[in-house]
């Protein structure tokens, strides 16, 4: 859901986002957005609230909302009355934090820190270490948009692990309020005195404010007496100025038609990605072309025929890369993705697809073009994409990468690990060192130089089991027994529940992390093989 604004102003230490007509101002509080309308004559302006609400563990229960209400009462916050009878907005969850005394303490904050272990488990469906950060929105200053998430981003404060939200706990909602919470009322008093009122035309229609719906569901309107309204007053009908407008994504960029079937006679369009206005990211159809035909296109004895000199070099380069990384079908090399029943070139295609999808530089488009040239020359029919096969391949490599990175993050949380003699090969040791350094460089709050030989050895132990194709949980269990860090098993179990196709900010963050880890492992492997250091 998106709310647009024209300008910002600072008033009483609050950032207000003022709409184009200057009759409405938004402000952020504890992951939610409050909207205040300009008073008219003696009538106060419309007050509304947008954001995530917590509900229950199933489609028809309100366990989580009731838990928050109960905790608020036990902590003596009787004056806090969450809106509605069933849901509790995210900013009320803030009040369970012992460091927060009222909504005033979470003004201008997009997220909520949850220290309550029971509530954190409700939100993530997992036992977590204390401290998760739940983000309900972001302000896109370059677009002048306040974006409210349909699904929150939940991150562990200590490990930075990104969780998938429980499916029934959160929902996007909007509510009409009779007044603001008492702690916030003084912040908006006199706000519009400093904002010039626009001159209304004589034939002015009733004002409206568009709320752009970008998710699959429109925010649920909540009818209630409002936060801190002081008792259950008489219900009355209200007419809101807000109008929900559904945003429909364009199927593809302007001027781009879907990729033609392989037997199309137009040679210029037969090669996926050859159009001048190609989409910025790879498509599953392109991956399927490579997945289906790469072994024939690059491995056949006469695969080089009819190609330019540069294309011949590219074909040989891809064959060499696939062998250096993954070996051959008869003699697979110990590396990530070993448990996948794929050929080396298929693994390479999925590897580059995941990296390229996150806008990182990769030769995936060149690989697609080469395979397209082959299917064009030989009239090879490529069937419709097998989505389950592609999903299994992508998720397998995606989860392997995330599991390796998550294990490195968990190990780096410990300055001292038990010294043990853990035999690790030179390739695995190089991978382990590179991955730890990459993750350490991303942890800005932690000073550098904390990577020890034990960190390298134990991550190497994890990678050795993973590279042998024995599975992520086997690798986590083996490493947990060596180190005594049992949280590794839980963390990798969390990874196994993630998908490369998860929606929302959390899914995007996981894909970015996985692509980064794969990029690091690819770089160090190819660099070592180029210098003849691979063992």
Swiss-Prot record:
CC annotations in GO: host cell cytoplasm; host cell nucleus; viral tegument
The keyword Cytoplasm appears for this protein: no
Outcome reported for the amino acid change (mutating residue 40 to Y): In strain: Nonneuroinvasive mutant HF10
Location in the cell: Virion tegument; Host cytoplasm; Host nucleus
UniProt keywords, alphabetically: Host cytoplasm, Host nucleus, Virion, Virion tegument
Residue ranges, annotated region (Disordered): 251-279
Protein's UniProt keywords contain Transport: no
Family, per entry: Belongs to the alphaherpesvirinae UL21 protein family.
Subunit-level organization: Interacts (via C-terminus) with UL16.
Function: May participate in DNA packaging/capsid maturation events. Promotes efficient incorporation of tegument proteins UL46, UL49, and US3 into virions. May also play a role in capsid transport to the trans-Golgi network (TGN).
This protein's name: Tegument protein UL21
Species of origin: Human herpesvirus 1 (strain 17)
């Amino acid at each position: 859901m998106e709310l647009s604004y024209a300008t910002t102003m600072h008033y009483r230490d609050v950032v207000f986002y003022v709409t184009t007509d200057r009759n409405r101002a938004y402000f952020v509080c504890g992951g939610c957005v409050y909207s205040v309308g300009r008073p008219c004559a003696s009538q106060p302006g419309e007050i509304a609230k947008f954001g995530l609400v917590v509900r229950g563990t199933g489609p028809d229960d309100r366990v989580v909302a009731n838990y928050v209400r109960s905790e608020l009462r036990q902590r003596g916050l009787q004056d806090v009355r969450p809106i509605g009878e069933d849901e509790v907005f995210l900013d009320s969850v803030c009040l369970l934090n012992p460091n927060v005394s009222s909504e005033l303490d979470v003004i201008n904050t997009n997220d909520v820190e949850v220290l309550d272990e029971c509530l954190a488990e409700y939100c993530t469906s997992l036992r977590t270490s204390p401290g998760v950060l739940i983000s309900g929105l972001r302000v896109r200053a370059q677009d002048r948009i306040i974006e409210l998430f349909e699904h929150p981003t939940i991150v562990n404060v200590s490990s930075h692990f990104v969780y998938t939200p429980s499916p029934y706990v959160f929902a996007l909602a909007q509510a009409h309020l009779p007044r603001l919470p008492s702690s916030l009322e003084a912040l908006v008093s006199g706000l519009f005195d400093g904002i010039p009122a626009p001159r209304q035309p004589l034939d002015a229609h009733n004002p409206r404010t568009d709320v752009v719906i970008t998710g699959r569901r429109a925010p649920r309107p909540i009818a209630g007496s409002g936060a801190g309204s002081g008792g259950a007053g008489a219900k009355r009908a209200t007419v809101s100025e807000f109008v929900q407008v559904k945003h429909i994504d364009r199927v593809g960029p302007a001027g781009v038609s879907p990729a033609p079937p392989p037997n199309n006679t137009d040679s210029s369009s037969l090669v996926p990605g050859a159009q001048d206005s190609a989409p910025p990211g790879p498509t599953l159809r392109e991956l399927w072309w490579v997945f289906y035909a790469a072994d024939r296109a690059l491995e056949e004895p006469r695969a080089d025929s009819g190609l330019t000199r540069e294309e011949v070099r590219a074909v040989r380069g891809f064959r060499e890369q696939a062998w250096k990384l993954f070996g051959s079908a008869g003699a697979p090399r110990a590396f990530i993705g070993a448990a996948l029943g794929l050929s080396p070139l298929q693994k390479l295609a999925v590897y580059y697809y995941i990296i390229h999808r996150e806008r990182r530089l990769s030769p995936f488009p060149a690989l697609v073009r080469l395979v397209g040239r082959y299917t064009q020359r030989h009239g090879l029919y490529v069937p419709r994409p097998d989505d389950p096969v592609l999903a299994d391949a992508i998720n397998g490599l995606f989860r392997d990468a995330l599991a390796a990175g998550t294990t490195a993050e968990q190990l780096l949380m410990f300055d001292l690990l038990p010294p043990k003699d853990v035999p690790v090969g030179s390739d695995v040791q190089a991978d382990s060192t590179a991955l730890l350094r990459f993750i350490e460089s991303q942890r800005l709050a932690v000073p550098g130089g904390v990577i020890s030989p034990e960190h390298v050895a134990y991550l190497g132990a994890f990678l050795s089991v993973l590279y042998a194709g024995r599975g992520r949980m086997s690798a986590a269990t083996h490493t947990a027994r060596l180190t005594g860090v049992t949280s590794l098993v839980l963390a990798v179990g969390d990874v196994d529940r993630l998908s490369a196709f998860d929606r929302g900010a959390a899914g995007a963050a996981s894909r970015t992390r996985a692509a980064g880890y794969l990029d690091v492992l690819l770089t160090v492997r190819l660099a070592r093989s180029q210098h003849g250091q691979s063992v």
